[in-house]
Amino acid sequence: MKSSHLQNLLLRRDKKAAEVLLQRLGKDENWSAVSLIDEMLPGLLFEANLTYGNFHQVKMALYLRRLIRENKLSRRSELTVLELLIEETLRRSWVNIEAGEIALAEKAENPLTAMLGELAENNLHNAFYYALQAYQEKPEELQDLLLCLGGVYGPENLGHSLSCFFPVLEEIVNSHNPAAETAILSYLSYLNRYDIPADFSPEDYQKTDMPENSLRLAASGQGIVNLHHMITLVTYWLWEKADFHDKNFPLPYRIYYQKRLADKGISSKRLKRVKEPLQVEVPGSYEEFRQSFNYDNIDHTTRLIRALWQDSQRKAWDWVCRLYAEDYEPGTWNPHFFTGIYLAFRLNEENLSDDKSGKEMAIDQAVEYYLNSVNY
């Protein structure tokens, strides 16, 4: 990692220095949350031992980075989520690896084919070499192929090989962020655990007839597995809209549908709740929202969040992210709290589906998961 005060204190795991830094940020307005998150990225991209089995920390950081970049969080909320990110990073295990752009001595005629051949042999070094060539020559094709590999092997890891890395590509690789090459190396290191054939063909995994009720199916059920059904489907839809996505590139929906939705039913209780009148008063301030947020009343609080979203998307982004961050407890925090609500909100904000009830169900599902899981 390149030298900076934040990076150095993270490398030293200096909790005292981190506390001093956060205190200073609380008194000074002249700081950029996006820049501070960027300083953390090399470490977050190479988390080791994977506390939650996958790269949730960098995903959560990039979701929050995007919201901050788009001015959707207040300054108070920015500081609160930074406190959470720094505290979590200090608690995690990660390795100090950083990659960068290089001038290539030899080039393959087709670097993507060469990369797949090396992955088939579990030769990470060579796979990364050809991935760098592809990133220089055809970055959009590289990103589609990497995500397709993640999607195909997603059922083996609850979809994390797609959902954890989509924001990495969207926010880091596609924008040619200084951490882009490190991000590509991290993704290849993750994919290298799977038996990827040298003749891998995206066309073998496409499905062009996803059912109209896919969102309602994905947003049904409780618990972490069912939440991931929604997370993965929304990630697919964001991928379809991504700047780097070639509209002719087939997405591996067949694997997702067969493994996740084919034998699943729609939650009648959740569908009924989102179709009923909200009948909840929208708070006028964050303090009132905090008081109205009832951790023991799922029916009330899911309606509260949906009512807040309908009243003001800006307030919903800001207040929910702040409340979740304020609820942070070291050792018990689950990054899926942010992942679930972020993707449910973004599904609605970008109108990724015409299914109004399905979109409401996604918010309901994410909030219910939080209420059932948070240690409060």
Explain the meaning of each model-derived region:
Residues 1-376:
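Mature, well-folded catalytic/scaffold domains that follow N-terminal targeting or propeptide regions
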